[in-house]
């Protein structure tokens, strides 16, 4: 099992007997990746390192990748402001019955529906990886990365 301590939320996506372990990994931004962990990831030799953050997030905290790993880097931006815009719109519409669960459910639907081209490209990358590891992340490794994990787990 690959252990990366300098990146939050780094873990294998595999669940259950249908999924192979040590092929798909999710995590938070890789901005604080230390030398030891860079070497571990280089040894893993991933097919791709997919970043779901938008350009503003990337500029604020770029991934700390080696030259070798930068060659594997793919940006598939999904705006994190989707959730904030939705909350503001609900308040404008007078929907004061905002519950955390409802807001999250609606924002996840927007992440899926407004970025179908991104999800299609993500799946194509996975299909082309030929059982070579893939790492994917966003800022916290929760929402966009969680949706990506959910898609994979449902497809398998």
Segments (PLM) and residue ranges:
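Cys-dependent protein tyrosine phosphatase-like superfamily
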Residues: 1-135, 147-156
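Ser/Thr-glycine-rich phosphate-binding loops at phosphate-binding pockets of nucleotides
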Residues: 140, 144-145
């Amino acid at each position: 099992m690959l252990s990366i301590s300098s990146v939050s939320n780094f873990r294998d996506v595999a669940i259950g007997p249908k999924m192979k372990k040590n092929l798909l990994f999710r995590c938070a931004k890789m901005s604080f990746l230390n030398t030891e962990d860079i070497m571990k990831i280089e040894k893993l030799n991933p097919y791709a390192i997919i970043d779901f953050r938008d350009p503003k997030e990337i500029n604020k905290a770029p991934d700390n990748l080696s030259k070798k790993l930068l060659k594997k880097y793919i940006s598939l931006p999904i705006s994190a402001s989707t959730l904030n815009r939705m909350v503001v719109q609900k308040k404008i519409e007078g929907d004061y019955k905002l519950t955390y669960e409802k807001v999250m459910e609606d924002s996840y639907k927007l992440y899926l529906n407004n970025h179908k081209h991104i999800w299609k490209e993500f799946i194509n990358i996975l299909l082309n990886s030929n059982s070579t590891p893939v790492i994917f992340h966003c800022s916290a490794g929760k929402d966009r990365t969680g949706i990506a994990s959910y898609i994979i787990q449902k497809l398998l």
